């Protein structure tokens, strides 16, 4: 069994690393308490040979000592690889300020800057135990993904991964899109009372939109545009391409168009994913 442990400071990219591992076929568990490592491996034995876990400051106290103890008790056939991700205090402060997420150590009387510094001190012993230390201060998510793949596979898989992401403009535009298409001008199922509670994943909505010549023409034009430029993007060593499709609420039109594009490109040589931001947020 192969076990990958990802640790590091909050905001340094642990979730990005876990997504890469998940794409590589690993069974991923986020923020697993260290004493449960052995139990997890025992439960997955025989069904999952690739396991990845992330640990962070919330699993303290004395995390480094607990980790050493847990690793010493791993089954002898376990092949272990460990990562520690870090970024400068300045970069972490900027990232948290941009996302407005709550830091794990933030309390009513502790500022964000103080929480970031405290976490760095608490995790310093952990950073000295790992196989691979990665400073992500100057890395974007694609650079970090490449580094993780390089370490695990011995080379960077340059197969282009295409992400089609639907979203609603009223909830804000995605920040990491390479291409963004506005489909708010297309016929809107929202005004059909029977379709209003449904989504672009539901057959009645799909049938409604498929009957609209304007919808089919626009999908074809996006497909043609991407097909034209994909070879040039691949020659530029791109690993990821994110195509964002936006409608008003991210429920009907953008979801349908993203799904249709994903189906068309799935027949090619690329890895293709369809993600629906607002639908996922509604489930959370």
UniProtKB/Swiss-Prot annotation:
Keywords: ATP-binding, GTP-binding, Nucleotide-binding
The keyword Magnesium is annotated on this UniProt entry: no
GO molecular function, one term: GTP binding
Binding site for GTP: 56-59
InterPro entries: P-loop_NTPase, RapZ-like, RapZ-like_N, RapZ_C
Chain sites annotated for binding ATP: 8-15
UniProt-listed Pfam families: PapZ_C, RapZ-like_N
Keyword GTP-binding: yes
Family per similarity comment: Belongs to the RapZ-like family.
Function: Displays ATPase and GTPase activities.
Listed PANTHER family: RNASE ADAPTER PROTEIN RAPZ
Name this polypeptide is given: Nucleotide-binding protein Sbal195_0713
Organism (species): Shewanella baltica (strain OS195)
């Amino acid at each position: 069994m192969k076990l990958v442990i990802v640790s590091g400071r909050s905001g340094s990219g642990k979730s990005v690393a876990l997504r890469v591992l998940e794409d590589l076929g690993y069974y991923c568990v986020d923020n697993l308490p260290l004493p449960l490592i052995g139990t997890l491996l025992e439960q997955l034995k025989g069904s999952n040979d690739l396991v990845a876990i992330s640990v962070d400051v919330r699993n303290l106290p004395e995390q480094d000592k607990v980790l050493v103890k847990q690793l010493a008790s791993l089954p002898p056939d376990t092949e272990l690889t460990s990562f520690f991700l870090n970024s400068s205090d300045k970069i972490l402060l900027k990232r948290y300020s941009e996302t407005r997420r709550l830091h794990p150590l933030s309390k009513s009387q502790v500022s964000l800057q103080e929480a970031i510094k405290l976490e760095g001190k608490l995790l310093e012993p952990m950073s000295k135990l790992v196989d691979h230390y990665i400073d992500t201060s100057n890395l974007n998510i694609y650079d970090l993904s490449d580094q993780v793949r390089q370490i695990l596979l011995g080379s960077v898989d340059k197969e282009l991964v295409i992400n089609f992401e639907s979203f609603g403009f009223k909830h804000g535009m995605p920040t990491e899109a390479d291409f963004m298409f506005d489909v708010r001008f297309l016929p809107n199922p929202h005004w059909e009372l029977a379709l209003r509670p449904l989504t672009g994943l539901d057959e009645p909505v799909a049938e409604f939109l498929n009957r609209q010549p304007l919808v089919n023409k626009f999908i074809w034009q996006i497909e043609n545009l991407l097909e034209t430029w994909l070879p040039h993007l691949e020659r530029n060593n791109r690993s990821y391409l994110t195509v964002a499709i936006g409608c008003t609420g991210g429920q009907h039109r953008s979801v349908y168009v993203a799904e249709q594009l994903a189906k068309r490109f799935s027949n090619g040589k690329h890895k293709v994913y369809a993600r629906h931001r607002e639908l996922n947020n509604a489930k959370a």
